[in-house]
């Protein structure tokens, strides 16, 4: 759902398990959130910090 999250994860060379660990989730839980887009505010904040990106960019749904 959020292509920029996946793109930044790939740029950082991180696996789904590594990102899930930072967020305090299971790998499957993180993958489900990627599909549904249902991240908590705290998880969004952690992803923005981890990838050094702004919220608007990281969670953009436009092409």
Features from the language model and the residues they span:
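Short alpha-helical "recognition helix" segments of helix-turn-helix
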Residues: 18-20
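DNA major-groove recognition helix of helix-turn-helix/homeodomain DNA-binding modules
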Residues: 43-57
């Amino acid at each position: 759902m959020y292509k920029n999250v996946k793109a930044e994860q790939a740029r950082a060379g991180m696996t789904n398990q590594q990102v899930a660990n930072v967020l305090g989730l299971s790998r499957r839980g993180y993958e489900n959130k990627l599909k549904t887009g249902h991240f908590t505010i705290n998880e969004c904040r952690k992803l923005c910090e981890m990838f050094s990106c702004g919220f608007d960019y990281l969670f953009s749904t436009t092409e």
